[in-house]
Each structure stands twice: as C-alpha cells, then as structure tokens.
C-alpha cells in the first residue's frame, strides 16, 4: 500500500507536473531543442500511461512492481539517461512511420462512424423524448377531465347504476339465482300447490265480478223518459167538427 502511494506521487510530480512546467518554459523561450525534447517525452509518456492502466490490473501482485515503475519514470526523465529520447528514436518513431497511413485511415473511419452513431442515437433520443412528452400531456388532459366531474355527476352515475336493482316500490330486486330458488321452493310446497289448484276459478269469478262491477258504471247511461203517445182517435175527434144532421131539421 505504501509503495503504491509513493509510486503515484512520483508519477504525478516527476512524471507530469515537472515536464509540464518545462514544456511551458520551452514554448515561452522558443527553444527548438527543448521543444523537441519535451515533445518526445510526452509521446513516450502517453504510451507509458496507457500500458500502466493495464499492468496495474494484471501485474500489481508482482513483487517490486511499484518500485520498478518509479525507477522507470525516473529513467525517462533523467537528463543523464535520456530514456524518453532513446525509446522514441529506437521504437516509437519507426513504428509510427510504418503504420502512419493505416492509423490515419482508422482514425477517419472511427470519426465517420462515431458521427453517424451520434446522429442515430440523437434521433432516437429525440423521438423518445417527444413520445414521452405527448404521453405526459395526454395523461395530464385526462386527469384534468376526470377532476372536472362534479360530485353531482358522480352521484347521478351511481344512482343510474343502482336503478336496475330496485323495484318500483323501492325494494331491491332479487338476483336471478334467488328468484329461481324461490320458484322451486313454491313448487315443492304441497299446501301452496293445493291453494293454487283451488284458487284459479275463484279468482277468475272474483276477477270477473270485479271487472263487471268496474265496467257497469261505465256502460250505464241515463235513460230518458219517452213521451206518452196520445190515442189517434182523440186527435181525430178534436180536429174534425161535428156535423148537424139534416134529418132532424126537416122533422122539426
């Protein structure tokens, strides 16, 4: 653990901060020799950082691994050993010169593919955002409409749902199953069957009498008295005058 902390401090201070300040001085003084020196160092240090990320995972268990890393950073930076310039001239520069065209092609393809991928992902993200916004707006409108219902409307809906279950006299209607049960019970009861066999005629006569009694006042009409007819003989006697007999006059 201590060796890991010391190695990190050495890499940050001697491998990063000091070369960064020296590069600033080279740019400020416009010293080409120093400028080239530190540019070679930064190229080698970039490869070292990439390899360090992998070796810390794979070789961290190796004995004296962190001590070797400290020694390597000092060897790169020391002006006596000039490790960065040696590695650059013998390994880095020849390899990059041979693979330069392929590396440029890979970079161009990666740039184009990354641009297309970003555009595709951006379009999908915009579509998803638009769909989410439309769905949220529809839910908001629906909730507002549901809230706009008054309590009176809700009670009316509740009463309309309860209407088919009530009779005209206000009592609840039985369910179909209970209705069938009551009918079967009535059919099984012998007393009720006897009553039903004897009562139909009586009920019919009573009903007919009641109907006749109800209908009689409707059919009855006031009877007008017919004028008495006078005998025709009396009328003829009144209308015809009496004639005097001629025989009686002659005799007189």
UniProtKB/Swiss-Prot annotation:
Transmembrane region(s): 1-21, 35-55
GO cellular component terms given for this protein: cytoplasmic microtubule; endoplasmic reticulum; endoplasmic reticulum membrane; endoplasmic reticulum tubular network; plasma membrane
Linked pathology: Spastic paraplegia 72A, autosomal dominant: A form of spastic paraplegia, a neurodegenerative disorder characterized by a slow, gradual, progressive weakness and spasticity of the lower limbs. Rate of progression and the severity of symptoms are quite variable. Initial symptoms may include difficulty with balance, weakness and stiffness in the legs, muscle spasms, and dragging the toes when walking. In some forms of the disorder, bladder symptoms (such as incontinence) may appear, or the weakness and stiffness may spread to other parts of the body. Spastic paraplegia 72B, autosomal recessive: A form of spastic paraplegia, a neurodegenerative disorder characterized by a slow, gradual, progressive weakness and spasticity of the lower limbs. Rate of progression and the severity of symptoms are quite variable. Initial symptoms may include difficulty with balance, weakness and stiffness in the legs, muscle spasms, and dragging the toes when walking. In some forms of the disorder, bladder symptoms (such as incontinence) may appear, or the weakness and stiffness may spread to other parts of the body.
Keywords annotated in UniProt: Disease variant, Hereditary spastic paraplegia, Membrane, Neurodegeneration, Phosphoprotein, Transmembrane, Transmembrane helix
Subcellular location: Membrane
Predominant localisation class: membrane
GO biological process: endoplasmic reticulum tubular network organization; protein transport into membrane raft; regulation of intracellular transport; sensory perception of bitter taste; sensory perception of sweet taste
Designated name of the protein: Receptor expression-enhancing protein 2
Function description: Required for endoplasmic reticulum (ER) network formation, shaping and remodeling. May enhance the cell surface expression of odorant receptors.
Skewed-composition ranges (Basic and acidic residues): 203-217
Family: Belongs to the DP1 family.
Domain of life of the source: Eukaryota
Tissue specificity note: Detected in brain, heart and skeletal muscle, and at low levels in placenta, kidney and pancreas. Expressed in circumvallate papillae.
UniProt effect for mutating residue 36 to E: In SPG72A; abolishes REEP2 interaction with membranes; affects correct shaping of the endoplasmic reticulum
Spans annotated as Disordered: 165-252
């Amino acid at each position: 653990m201590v060796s890991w902390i010391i190695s990190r401090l050495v890499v940050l201070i001697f491998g990063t901060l000091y070369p960064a300040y020296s590069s600033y001085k080279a740019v400020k003084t416009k010293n080409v020799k120093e400028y080239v020196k530190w540019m070679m160092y930064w190229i080698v240090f970039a490869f070292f950082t990439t390899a360090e990320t992998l070796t810390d995972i794979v070789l961290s268990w190796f004995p004296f691994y962190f001590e070797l890393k400290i020694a390597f950073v000092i060897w790169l930076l020391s002006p006596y050993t000039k490790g960065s310039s040696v590695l650059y001239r013998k390994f880095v520069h020849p390899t990059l010169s041979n693979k330069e065209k392929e590396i440029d092609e890979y970079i161009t393809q990666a740039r184009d593919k990354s641009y297309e991928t970003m555009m595709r992902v951006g379009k999908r993200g915009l579509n998803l955002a638009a769909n989410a916004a439309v769905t949220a707006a529809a839910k908001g409108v629906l909730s507002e409409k549901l809230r706009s219902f008054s309590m009176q409307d809700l009670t009316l809906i509740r009463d309309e749902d309860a209407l088919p279950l009530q009779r005209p006299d206000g009592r609840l209607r039985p369910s179909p199953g209970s209705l069938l049960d009551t009918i079967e019970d009535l059919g099984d009861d012998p007393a009720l069957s006897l009553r039903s066999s004897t009562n139909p005629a009586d009920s019919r006569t009573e009903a007919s009498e009641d109907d006749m009694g109800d209908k009689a006042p409707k059919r009855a009409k006031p009877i007008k008295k017919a004028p008495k007819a006078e005998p025709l003989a009396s009328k003829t006697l009144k209308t015809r005058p009496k004639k005097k007999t001629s025989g009686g006059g002659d005799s007189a």
